[in-house]
Amino acid sequence: MAEAAESAPAPPPAEPAAKKKKQQPKKAAAARGAAKSKKPSSGPSVSEQIVTAVSASKERSGVSLAALKKTLAAGGYDVDKNNSRLKLALKVTKETLLQVKGSGASGSFKLNKKQLQSKDKAAAKKKAPLAAEAKKPAAAAKKTAKSPKKPKKVSAAAKSPKKLKKPAKAAKSPAKKTAVKPKVAAKSPAKAKAAKPKVAKAKKAAPKKK
């Protein structure tokens, strides 16, 4: 009995394993949160936001960096954390933006309308060949759909044997020729008989001269 009592208190050391299991879900949740934070935002890029902000402004002298920061902050962009990105974006978008005043990222900026027009034309040229290529398969599909109508020509060729009725007319024409010839032969003996009596009358008139 004493041995059984001594062996009974052994189960308590299993508690730290249970604590480890409870700690694991917390670590997994933290890792998921970090992964979510690393995912890129689905919104527009910094350069796109800058271009939209400059295009929206009506100032003739251009938009300053401070005004750009204000408009970006109003749109929900964290300007303080992404200040370096904002400056890089201004350098990248120099083709679409014209720096009216200042140098570098500091200064005022305007939209480069000529550059935008050239980009629009280039995009339109790219779209035109793609549209032409898309039309070609559609035209080819229409031709293949129309091609099964060709068997109708075979049916027209099958109807052509009806033209063989013409030899029947040729068979009728010899019958007419044979019917006309006997009439001519019948008339010629009658003329010969009528000519003979005239010769006999001439012979009788000769003795009167003596």
Curated annotation (Swiss-Prot):
Any one Gene Ontology cellular component term annotated for this protein: nucleus
Compositional bias per record (Low complexity), positions renumbered to this chain: 26-45, 129-142, 181-192
Chief site of localization: nucleus
Alphabetical UniProt keywords: Chromosome, DNA-binding, Nucleus
Ranges annotated as biased composition (Basic residues): 143-153, 160-180, 193-210
Matching SUPFAM superfamilies: Winged helix' DNA-binding domain
GO-annotated biological processes: nucleosome assembly
GO molecular function terms noted in the UniProt entry: DNA binding; structural constituent of chromatin
Keyword Translocase included in the entry's annotation: no
Span of domain H15: 42-113
Family (UniProt): Belongs to the histone H1/H5 family.
Protein's job: Histones H1 are necessary for the condensation of nucleosome chains into higher-order structures.
Protein name per Swiss-Prot or TrEMBL: Histone H1A
Organism expressing this protein natively: Xenopus laevis (African clawed frog)
